[in-house]
């Protein structure tokens, strides 16, 4: 056999082997494709069957507010929200308020309200993108960021076409999805600081710039739209609406300075009852007045009231009833281990050493503050004991921290100094000032109330139980301005007070719109005593002390 024949045989053998190899590959691909198609059809059929199954509409969706009128008790907050977003120049907004008062519902409705305004820049197809800051986690390497967006570099893309070609692939985030609309971030106070800083840059530029080590302007293999994204950025012209249960001081100043702040207040009992009544009507259930009052007694916000109605309605439906019994609500309250709310009211009769102070906790939420004082003559040197207040507080930043005596504790010292000028010598008494309620009190606004209580306890003078008061006191007996006056006046009225004493510097014309309570501005502690003590010779005693003070001042 010649060498030519041998070469042909070898070539034939190799040709057969190569042919068998490619035939085997094609067969495997065909088998794999058939298997994938079969699996795909199976999954599609499963999805189709699942989509054919649907439950009835949950009660929670039935009672969800569909108009601003369904949001109870937040008229001022909604008015501010509309002013910020429904005009020709909408602004970024942060909504503060306790849970379950309608912050999220108002944010969902405000865009539809803005679309109805012909002067609004929002279009009919403007989107509302919702994001929960507690779950908006991101990768510090920039692989994934649901808020800002990210770039999938080829090393992370796997077997994709762009990955094999070495092309970075941009992925847009929620800020781009919300372009031309509203981006709502629930619990914005929980947002990671890095994401917060990135978003501040987006709010300024109104676009998102992405970076990648794999991107090159000279690379002609990269598609044109990716070049455009890296060079011009992703559009992100939206309006931010954030909601938080935190106080304004806990939100970074950088984001606060760029947003209009709107405050939603805590619902009172009557408003919670109204929410419960509306919820019962939406689920087509009848409920008695006793049941409504019971819900108002136990529910602390609108969401809790709706939950009580839903569970009670479920019990009634299971028993084929169209009305909710009081027993249903009692059972739900008992099984949920709810405790009734304690709403403080003024004491029914005047007492010695009992003063109605006022406090504020949370945005636009005030409360009556009972202040109890006893004064017992001491055998030797007396003492002053204060309970129920914050003794010490810490202030500072990340780099340094300062600890100091609390403002409430400092206010007690001011009170004792002023009372010494009125011949009330604390050294001769064992004085106990108590703030009951279990919540530590801080701040200087209870100064005039503590002074009134101590003077009453020492001189055995009755305090008018229908008067509430708030104000800081200086060591010269002057009443200084404080914060949260509007909320405190509303709380005094709700507690049954007929008069409320406030610092004169806090008096504003809009406070006269509060009906049902007399607002009395004062400048001196003497005025507070004249308005508070129920004793005929009180004026004479104060005039004597005032005359002595003026004589001493002239001699100096």
Predicted regions located by residue number:
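Walker A/P-loop
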Residues: 85-136, 200
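Conserved alpha-helical scaffold flanking the Walker A/P-loop in AAA+ ATPase domains
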Residues: 81-85, 144-182, 224-231
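Conserved C-terminal "switch" segment of AAA+ ATPases
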Residues: 117-123, 248-254, 261-323, 421-430, ...
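Conserved catalytic/switch belt of AAA+ P-loop NTPases
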Residues: 152, 156, 194-233
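Peripheral, non-AAA+ core regions of ATP-driven protein-machinery
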Residues: 369, 375-556
